[in-house]
Amino acid sequence: MTAALVDRALSIGADPRESADERFRRRLLVGVALIILPFGFVWGCLYWAIGEHAVALTPWAYVTGSAISLAVFARTRNFATLRTAQQVLILVAPALGTIMLGGLDESSSVILWCLFAPLGAVAFDRPGRAWPW
């Protein structure tokens, strides 16, 4: 039952015409996005618990944006839109969090999460697309 549920979740936006490589990339990105959702929510709760209420909105906005992009992808099956939305979210959320926390000293290594944007471009698109990120 669990395997069937996971397979169904990873089949969001499935297109019967996609190649095996496209299917793998789609399922991987959907899986990564779904796994990060609860972590982003908990991350926001931790900021809230330590009194950083404004900063808590950053990971919660990431979770909301990610969920919306997944819902849009489920309807439109436009992988490029999902990929771009996820890359923008993973680039902007940590940068905003770092700024809101007062810079690099106060935010520790939160900014390092931004490195996932170019890595995502390599993994889910083609390597040449990593440079703009």
Model-based region annotation:
Residues M1-E22:
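Short, Lys/Arg-rich, polar N-terminal cytosolic tail immediately upstream
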Residues D15-S19, N78, G102-G103, G128-R129:
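Intrinsic-disorder/low-complexity, polar/charged segments
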Residues L28-E106, V110-G120, W133:
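Hydrophobic transmembrane alpha-helices and their membrane-interface boundaries in multi-pass
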Residues F124-W133:
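The cytoplasmic-loop to transmembrane-helix boundary for the fourth helix
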